[in-house]
Swiss-Prot record:
Domain of life: Eukaryota
Protein name, UniProt field: Uncharacterized protein ycf21
Subcellular location: Plastid, Chloroplast
Disulphide bond pairs: none
Native source organism of the sequence: Pyropia yezoensis
Keywords: Chloroplast, Plastid
UniProt family annotation: Belongs to the ycf21 family.
A GO CC annotation given for this chain: chloroplast
Pfam families referenced in this protein's UniProt entry, alphabetically: Rv2949c-like
Length: 174
């Protein structure tokens, strides 16, 4: 499940530094998009509900045919116990990092790091806002949709590239 906003909808790419002082962007989106903490924890606070992870798939790919370098792609829906889909997340890991750190595909990455007391940080590369008929059908709500992608670091080394798309329903919990 890959979404290419450019091919089927309008999109605006926004740098993280453009969000801070923009008064037209609701505070909820600033917190969700720029927060350094676990989205799963933020989701619990925002919605006053436990979050649920719906594991879509975990696949292994090689970068080049017959290459010894393998990558893991994990895709999940995160929602609350009202069964709302609030986020789609796709993460790419080198297989060594994935096997060393991530043992339970049905657990949220943020929860894993928090409960394990692992020190990690993220470097947000890009934020985007756009409309997509495909996303409206998957989330079952009209757009626009915010999204971001970032690199996750552990012990100063990159371990994962994460791509997230957020449901407009998050605005209802303000």
């Amino acid at each position: 499940m890959t979404f290419n906003f450019i091919s089927f909808c309008r999109i605006e790419v926004i740098l993280p530094c453009q969000i801070y002082s923009n008064t037209s962007i609701p505070l909820i989106w600033k917190i969700v998009l720029l927060g350094d903490g676990s989205f799963t924890r933020h989701c619990q606070i925002i919605t006053y509900r436990d979050t649920e992870i719906n594991h879509i798939s975990t696949s292994i790919y090689s970068k080049v045919h017959n290459s010894p370098q393998f990558y893991v792609n994990r895709r999940v829906w995160i929602g609350n116990n009202l069964k709302n889909k609030l986020i789609f997340a796709s993460s790419w890991w080198n297989i060594e990092s994935y096997q060393a750190i991530y043992k339970y595909p049905s657990r949220a990455i943020g929860s894993l790091f928090i409960q394990s007391d692992l020190d990690y940080y993220r470097d947000i590369h890009c934020l985007f806002l756009g409309y997509s008929t495909e996303l409206e059908n998957l989330f079952l709500v009209p757009g626009p949709f915010w999204g971001r992608y970032y690199t996750l670091f552990y012990k100063g080394k990159p371990i994962s590239l994460i791509y997230e798309i957020f449901s407009p329903l998050l605005e209802n919990f303000q």
